[in-house]
Amino acid sequence: MASQLRVYVPEHPLIKHWLGVARDENTPPVLFKTAMGELGRWLTYEAARYWLPTVDTEVKTPLAIAKASLIDPQTPFVIVPILRAGLALVEGAQGLLPLAKIYHLGLVRNETTLEPSLYLNKLPERFAPGTHLLLLDPMLATGNTIMAALDLLMARDIDANLIRLVSVVAAPTALQKLSNAHPNLTIYTAMIDEQLNDRGYIVPGLGDAGDRCFGT
């Protein structure tokens, strides 16, 4: 059976709330950044539900021995935010995966061609076998940036089945590209918006998430 891209839009009231705050053009940068951090937290929570491997063990309570299920300490976890806007999602995600290593990836989009160029690559030469990777990109618009990021990850022996992509807003254009190129991928997003404008921005979207986070 052929693989098929899995896209989840969690029906969580806190995700809906913080998305509404982030969408509002009157939200000041400090609150916008807070909203993005909360979206990073709750979308990571949803993404981790069937993704975190556990081991069965026993612990001693003050009264007796109890069975317990703990996150497998042998599994390597990695968070990769795509700069700049991906930084806003890191705090929330890292709060749930405190032992994860964080590797930064900087990609900037040419506003004329809409093609990305790489300006920062802190990825390792290779990822350890079995690495679980959380990829953070707030806006999946044309799909060009996320495709470039995935090319860099795949060249370093990451297993697409072990990637969870967290995005705040996604457009059908990007999802179609990802479906064609990486059907094993799993995506968690707060919303799938209808379309892109002639500048490649998602509509209604959030505007420029990086600019809004940092007040520039």
Curated annotation (Swiss-Prot):
UniProt keywords (A-Z) are: Allosteric enzyme, Glycosyltransferase, GTP-binding, Magnesium, Nucleotide-binding, Transferase
Q: Which InterPro entries does the record cross-reference, listed alphabetically?
A: PRibTrfase_dom, PRTase-like, Upp_B, UPRTase/APRTase, Ura_phspho_trans
Annotated 5-phospho-alpha-D-ribose 1-diphosphate binding lies at: 84, 109, 137-145, 208
**Catalyses which reaction?**
UMP + diphosphate = 5-phospho-alpha-D-ribose 1-diphosphate + uracil
Biological processes annotated in GO? UMP salvage; uracil salvage
Q: Its GO CC terms?
A: cytoplasm
Q: Which NCBIfam families match?
A: PRK00129.1 (NF001097), upp (TIGR01091)
Main function:
Catalyzes the conversion of uracil and 5-phospho-alpha-D-ribose 1-diphosphate (PRPP) to UMP and diphosphate.
The Swiss-Prot or TrEMBL record describes its family as follows: Belongs to the UPRTase family.
The name of this protein is: Uracil phosphoribosyltransferase
Naturally occurring in which organism (per UniProt): Synechocystis sp. (strain ATCC 27184 / PCC 6803 / Kazusa)
Phylogenetic lineage: Bacteria, Bacillati, Cyanobacteriota, Cyanophyceae, Synechococcales
